[in-house]
Amino acid sequence: MVSSPATQLSVLATDGRLQFLYPHQNVRLDTLTLQKTDTMKRLVSLFLLAPLAISTLTLSANGQKAYKIALSNSFYGNTWRKQMVDVMQKAADGAKAQGLISDFVVDNGDGTANTQLAQLNSLILSHPDAILINAASPTALNGAIAQAAQQGIKVVIFDSLTTSTDAYQIAYDNSSWGEIAANYVVKRLGSKGGNVLITRGVVGSQPELLIYGAIMKILKSHPENHILGEVDTEADNAKAQSAVANLLPSMPKMDAVLSEGSYGVVQAFLAAGKPVPLVIGNNRAEFILWWIDEKAKNGYQTISLGSEPSIGVVAFWLSIHILQGDKVPEMKAQPYLLPLVAVDNDTVEQFKDIKPGTVIAHQYDDQWVKDNILNKQ
């Protein structure tokens, strides 16, 4: 795997505390501002070009082609994915105003590979210049991706990756996410262990498979911990609350729950009148705000880990640079990795102003991509 430059992965220190500070400087968050930065001023002249009978290309004001970009998003059923589409649309609107793109098409799926494959085949027939894919399956889309590449369409896969080598791929180190979460639980439960419930995310997606696999590997290597079961949540708080609430009457005491739908898990325990166990967070606003309050009242301790919906913006700007012929890092044989965002008891108050209904995420833009990816090869 290719790691992004100047990054530091979340790790557990010998005392069990999570040591993490997001390494990139001069970046803002989608949901709050931690550090003020100067926004690059862009002066763009826009002209209306009369259609040319001899050409079907859409040209920008400087005579360069304005690209058509398409997004194939496998799933739209949780806060993370909705925020992802929103910030990508905002980036596309800005690029269109600059004359860099002529259109941005979004296809949202139902979480199944079959639906996404059908949508992807339809997109290929429309022949956009680039297709951005958040994949439902690591393998099911490979044939369509190869077909797109053969037709000269640039393909950038992000967040949920595939095994294709025909596309540029960028994601997070999700195996480390699972390892960090599980190791923290093992450390907190101690030598006597305890009862653990697994709450899974978007089952079948590549990130979820990596997170789940890493969690299970760690827990099974510590047999003092008993896995009570697992439930699917689609990384959605409401689904997590319902699934956990259905289990609670028949389950023995739970000591830890990891790692999706964290606020829904909390609500299930509270509604049942049971004490909230150790719950690993997933960087959703509702859990972060509950944690801050519960820490102040009762000293609640945990960690929260997550990828960022704004990775879609990174993929968007990368696709434009690829189309413009700019040199980008190797991303086909091995994915390019961004660092996870991790929060612990020492840093959670930094996010007290997070907007409800959002996920902690940096606000990436074209300049960030230039400074931190293109110019650091």
Where on the chain are the PLM-derived regions?
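Short, low-complexity disordered leader/linker segments with a strong preference
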Residues: 1-68, 125, 146-151, 371-377
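Hinge/cleft segment of the Venus flytrap/periplasmic-binding protein
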Residues: 65-67, 207, 218-219, 307, ...
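Extracytoplasmic "Venus flytrap"
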Residues: 68-95, 104-117, 126, 134-138, ...
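Extracytoplasmic ligand-binding site segments that recognize negatively charged/polar headgroups
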Residues: 74-84, 173-174, 181, 197-218, ...
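Short beta-strand elements in bilobed, periplasmic/extracellular small-molecule ligand-binding domains
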Residues: 95-109, 197-198, 219-237
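Hydrophobic alpha-helical segments within soluble ligand-binding/sensing domains
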Residues: 116, 170-195, 240-241, 285-290, ...
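Hydrophobic alpha-helical
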Residues: 121, 125, 129-149, 215, ...
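Flexible loop/hinge segments that line or gate small-molecule binding clefts
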Residues: 138-176, 286-297
